[in-house]
């Protein structure tokens, strides 16, 4: 029996974001020391950009073909995605043709797969970002039109139930958007905001859409209504408790 761990991510070309991703990959690799470690990136655009810099990254089918050619029989595929959604569905579809080509091919769950995960992640993030007097903590999620996007407002509810009414969750490409939670922030009387990514990596979205100098960035939009802003450019991948959650997901599918 030859066993492999295949870590699947969307990918990023931002160096700071790659540090976040590598932290999760290292944690997963350490939790399965007897497995051959491999990685795949699902974003064709990211793979193309990396290739233009002389860096090759496998797609998911390419990585699976390589493992087959090397004689691996048992493969654990662990995504670093945050939730079920279109990207996760894509992974499921791409591994389906390989299910009977390995003795065992198992797909792990995303980070926020059930209500226990939401509560655990919120607890970890509450400890990572303690409440600051007079300051709102605003988290930027990616967002999706997939029904799984309900996770974002659910997370804000979980924070509130854990006593953190200062935490607000919005998305850059989905619902709720910043402008939909801004009235809540203003009604609560906050004049200071701490922006942090609710993203695995602090990549393009965090650097530009959240903390950028452009007028449409979240930082600029908040400053335009006389709210002072500070930003943290560290993705969830750098948080030890979040790394541990991913490792627990992996353990569910190891043999």
How would you label these PLM feature ranges?
Residues 1-255:
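Active-site-proximal alpha-helix that buttresses catalytic centers in soluble enzyme cores
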């Amino acid at each position: 029996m030859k066993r492999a761990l295949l870590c699947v991510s969307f990918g990023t070309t931002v160096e700071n974001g790659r540090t976040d991703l590598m932290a999760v990959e290292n944690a997963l690799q350490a939790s399965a020391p007897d497995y051959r470690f491999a990685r795949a990136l699902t974003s064709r655009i990211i793979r193309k950009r990396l290739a233009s810099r002389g860096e090759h990254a496998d797609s998911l089918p390419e990585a699976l073909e390589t493992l087959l050619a090397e004689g691996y029989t048992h493969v654990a595929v662990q995504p670093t995605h945050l939730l079920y959604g279109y990207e996760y569905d894509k992974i499921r579809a791409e591994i389906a043709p390989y299910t009977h080509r390995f003795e065992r091919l198992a797909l792990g769950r995303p980070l926020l797969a059930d209500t226990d995960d939401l509560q655990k992640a919120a607890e970890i993030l509450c400890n990572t970002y303690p409440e600051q007097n007079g300051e709102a903590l605003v988290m930027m999620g990616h967002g999706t039109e997939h029904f799984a996007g309900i996770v974002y407002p659910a997370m804000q509810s979980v924070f509130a139930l854990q006593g953190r009414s200062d935490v607000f969750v919005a998305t850059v490409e989905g619902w709720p958007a910043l402008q939909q939670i801004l009235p809540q922030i203003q009604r609560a009387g906050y004049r200071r905001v701490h922006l942090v990514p609710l993203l695995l990596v602090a990549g393009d979205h965090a650097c530009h859409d959240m903390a950028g100098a452009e007028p449409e960035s979240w930082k600029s939009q908040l400053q335009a209504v006389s709210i002072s802003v500070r930003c943290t450019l560290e993705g969830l991948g750098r948080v030890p408790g979040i790394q541990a959650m991913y490792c627990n997901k992996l353990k569910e599918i190891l043999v």
